Amino acid sequence: MVIIRLARGGSKKRPFYNIVATDSRSRRDGRFIERVGFYNPVATKGESLRIAQDRLTYWQGVGAQLSPTVQRLVKEAQKAQPAA
């Protein structure tokens, strides 16, 4: 089963997450199928969240599940998008 979840990057105490479509059996930071976006929780200026909505819609259309954290981030991105 394909799942869309966060893969951690960055250095110690400076997290950076890629939003990736991956097989549910692969490790958190392991092999993935496609990078769909990113989330930078420590960003002070600039964008902290970017999601390719078209690719996210595609993966959901073929049966991919979202992790709870990615669901929360997608809702946050959709709220911010109409304001922009």
Swiss-Prot record:
Biological processes per GO annotation: translation
GO cellular component, one term: cytoplasm
tRNA-binding as UniProt keyword: no
Alphabetical UniProt keywords: Ribonucleoprotein, Ribosomal protein
InterPro entries in the record: Ribosomal_bS16, Ribosomal_bS16_dom_sf
Record-stated family: Belongs to the bacterial ribosomal protein bS16 family.
NCBIfam families: S16
Annotated protein name in UniProt: Small ribosomal subunit protein bS16
Organism for this UniProt entry: Paraburkholderia phymatum (strain DSM 17167 / CIP 108236 / LMG 21445 / STM815) (Burkholderia phymatum)
Gene: rpsP
